[in-house]
Amino acid sequence: MPEFTYEIVETLGTLSETAKGWTKELNLISWNDRPAKYDVRDWAPEHAKMGKGCTLSPDEVILLRDLLNEIDL
């Protein structure tokens, strides 16, 4: 697996937490020194490990927001 680097630029919020302390978070993350993108992903306590996630550009976040606003909850 290729090596990569990341920096959590800003923590925007926690969506959920498991009994083992893993959290699903929305963060602004810079991957491999590139401009930061929005990222939803599971994190172990202290961000020691990460699970699979979904990275979104600002334009994709706007579209997602619009789609979510159309849902009748």
Give, region by region, the residue ranges found by the protein language model.
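Positively charged, low-complexity terminal tracts
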Residues: 1-73
